[in-house]
Amino acid sequence: MENTLVKSLYRDTDKYAGQTVQVSGWIRNLRDSKAFGFIELNDGSFFKSVQIVFDTELDNFKEIAKLPLSSSVKVEGKVIVTPGAKQPFEIKAEKIDIEGLSDSDYPLQKKRHTFEYLRTIAHLRPRTNAFSATFRVRSIAAFAIHQFFQERGFVHVHTPIITGSDTEGAGEMFRVTTQDLNNVPKGEDGQVDESKDFFGKETNLTVSGQLNAEAYALAFRDVYTFGPTFRAENSNTTRHAAEFWMVEPEIAFAELGDVMNLTEDMLKYAMKYVLEHAPEEMEFFNSFVDKTVLERMNNVINSDFGRITYTEAIKVLQESGADFKYPVEWGIDLQTEHERYLSEEIFKRPVFVTDYPKDIKAFYMRLNDDGKTVAATDLLVPGIGELIGGSQREERMDVLVDRIKELGMNEEDYWWYLELRKYGGTKHAGFGLGFERFLMYITGMANIRDVIPFPRTPGSSEF
């Protein structure tokens, strides 16, 4: 008999009512008495489990009644509609085959476990309700983002993981080397001889695919990358990880306003898609993780995002009378408390802050006519603060070279990036969305380690 997915049974119960079906999955819960028993079976296709009713008519009743949690079984039985019960239907088992026994020391027993404990068994945590919901939403949200860009004719670019340049100029990068670390070749000056390494120069894991995406935007017009990025930042916070995923679109013949419009459209599209395609998971988050999740998402979807310049924002914050922990001064980056105040108290909706001081932003952002600010924007959202950062890129070769020199960066590392301005360069813009931060926002999960399947953080590279 062909296997039927539990998702299909829930989505089309009337079609299967009274029919004999075969389902296979893992035992989430089992209760039994002398004459009958109940199994909660989850097959991974759906957030909810299906209830299997079995009794002494089964030849192996006693064996089934003693099965440990997480044992895998294959069940044949009749679909019985149960309109008055908790679940809309159950399966009356006619045959249960044991596919794989679980040892009795299976760590996910019936009691609730803390997220902190579940991180120590990251290979098993997707079997819990919270993480089943989280990682299905992660999958659905990723698909939504791809679909958004594909529907609009964007080209998906696979940018390199290993790079010879630092997009952010931050220097917090993971080195890539094949050198024998106990016998590193050195030059006459006592420094490491990079020419003897695999690539013949210093290379690192990428912190962003943006620079490479810009090259493709100047050929395909509209492109995006969606891939892993790495920061060797020794931050043990709930918002930082050493490995995370970034969504980075890049659009040619575009200015800052165009990229803000794109940002707003993409966020609303992805949120609507998740609400539509993961209703059970989102209801779970709203009930058990963060009771404001659905309200927050609907606020974003139904709002016109606000816009304010950094200079105006500083003035508003200074005149607010609010007691901030960190000072509010022109030239200093906004802290989370400032960002949240703007989005939650002043605008009460998402807001773009634009035109930041050049000294607190990256080298590639377009210098404004005032010579002090750049065409950059951060999207601030209620409940979290900054969610997305974007900018118009500097298309003027001389201005870009001056900026690289001003920051003490090595111009030679960016020869190809500068050359893009030499051969038909045009105005272009883009943004970066930390995918995990987006997931934290829509699920209410408070720690970035809980929205990445196998998190990589300082001192932690298990699994």
Swiss-Prot record:
GO biological process: asparaginyl-tRNA aminoacylation
Xref: InterPro entries: Aa-tRNA-synt_II, aa-tRNA-synth_II, aa-tRNA-synth_II/BPL/LPL, Asn-tRNA-ligase, Asp/Asn-tRNA-synth_IIb, NA-bd_OB-fold, NA-bd_OB_tRNA
Protein's cellular compartments: Cytoplasm
Pfam families in UniProt: tRNA-synt_2, tRNA_anti-codon
Xref: PROSITE patterns: AA_TRNA_LIGASE_II
Disulfide linkage: none
EC numbers for this chain: 6.1.1.22
Gene Ontology terms, MF aspect: asparagine-tRNA ligase activity; ATP binding; catalytic activity, acting on a protein; nucleic acid binding; transferase activity
Protein family: Belongs to the class-II aminoacyl-tRNA synthetase family.
Subunit structure: Homodimer.
Designated name of the protein: Asparagine--tRNA ligase
Organism of origin: Bacillus cereus (strain ATCC 10987 / NRS 248)
